[in-house]
């Protein structure tokens, strides 16, 4: 951490940790839409709508995290090849998916994203509590969405 005449500047460690989160939330928005478009079966409508909520939160998170990175004088990278190569989310099939399988995939993708946030949280908080507060908010929101999705079939 350094404070310069231009303000607080993130260390390479903080920048790298925020980039990991940015990569996963960006991937989550894509995975969420892939599932949203290709689900079929019982409970379609409610899962379809839950996935829209997940995507909306993921897009909001990616924007907030990227803008926080810029405020800390870091260049965020949301390029498709970076997101594709570096995200930690499970792979989603390129086919029609039954709702029960889609629920499992959605929860796994959310949990992977939250896992990344929890993994980097302590190091982020040690350097920048404001960035850690952002992570706290999205951890709470994503875990709530995972609970909603699991609960619709009595899995919570």
PLM regions and their residue ranges:
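A structural signal for well-ordered alpha-helices, especially hydrophobic packing surfaces
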Residues: 22, 29-32, 36, 55, ...
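Charge-rich, acidic-biased intrinsically disordered regions
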Residues: 2, 6-9, 45-46, 52-53, ...
């Amino acid at each position: 951490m350094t404070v310069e005449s231009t303000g607080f500047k993130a260390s390479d460690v903080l920048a790298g940790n925020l980039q990991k989160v940015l990569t996963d939330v960006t991937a989550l928005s894509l995975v969420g839409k892939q599932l949203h478009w290709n689900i079929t079966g019982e409970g379609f409508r409610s899962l379809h709508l839950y996935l829209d909520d997940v995507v909306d939160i993921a897009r909001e998170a990616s924007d907030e995290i990227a803008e926080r990175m810029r405020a800390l004088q870091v260049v965020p990278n949301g390029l498709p090849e970076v997101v594709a190569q570096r995200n930690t989310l499970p792979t989603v099939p390129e086919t029609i998916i039954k709702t029960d399988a889609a629920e499992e995939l959605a929860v796994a993708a959310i949990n992977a994203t939250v896992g990344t946030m929890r993994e980097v949280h302590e190091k982020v908080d040690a350097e920048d509590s404001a960035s850690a507060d952002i992570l706290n908010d999205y951890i709470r929101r994503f875990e709530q969405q995972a609970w909603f999705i699991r609960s619709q079939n009595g899995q919570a």
